[in-house]
Amino acid sequence: MVRPKPTSVLSFDYGHKRIGLAGCDPLGITVTALSPIHRISFQKDLTLIKSLCIEREIKGLIVGLPLDESGQNTVQSIHCQNYGIKIAKELDLPLAWVNEHSSSWDAGQKYNLQNDRTGKLDSAVAALLLEQWLREGPELQPVSKLDSPRIKF
């Protein structure tokens, strides 16, 4: 994979109850786990994410996809794709996907958060996904190239 051009991005570990978040500086040097969002509704998520994007001058979004061992979509990865597309279109920001297979286990081990239920693990996962994206890509895709969501939120 080709290393993407560094830019200020926001990374998501999407879940039905929480969304883990992480961001990086415009040069892609420092990755920071941010406070997770405890989900209530899509509109509330959007309001919080939009505010964060303005505050951090975000130029793109990274969404983790929980693919199976063979790299195929799962029910949850389809939810993640649709959520990411909807957020990217609402914010008019480019988007990239990162395979997050086993990332919760990796983050739990790395940060000793195996039994966390507060959302710290979700944001630690988002940070690992962002680090992976900075190393491996892929490039951010413009909103105009994204398919329409298939599932309503």
Swiss-Prot record:
It is found in: Cytoplasm. Its EC number is 3.1.-.-. One of its GO terms (cellular component) is cytosol. GO terms for biological process: rRNA 5'-end processing. PANTHER family: POLYNUCLEOTIDYL TRANSFERASE, RIBONUCLEASE H-LIKE SUPERFAMILY PROTEIN. SMART domains: YqgFc. Belongs to the YqgF nuclease family. It comes from the Bacteria. It comes from Prochlorococcus marinus (strain SARG / CCMP1375 / SS120). Gene3D superfamilies: YqgF/RNase H-like domain. Pfam families: RuvX. HAMAP family: Nuclease_YqgF. The keyword Hydrolase applies. Could be a nuclease involved in processing of the 5'-end of pre-16S rRNA. GO terms for molecular function: nuclease activity. InterPro entries: RNaseH-like_sf, YqgF, YqgF/RNaseH-like_dom, YqgF/RNaseH-like_dom_sf. Keywords: Cytoplasm, Hydrolase, Nuclease, Ribosome biogenesis. The keyword Membrane does not apply. This is Putative pre-16S rRNA nuclease.
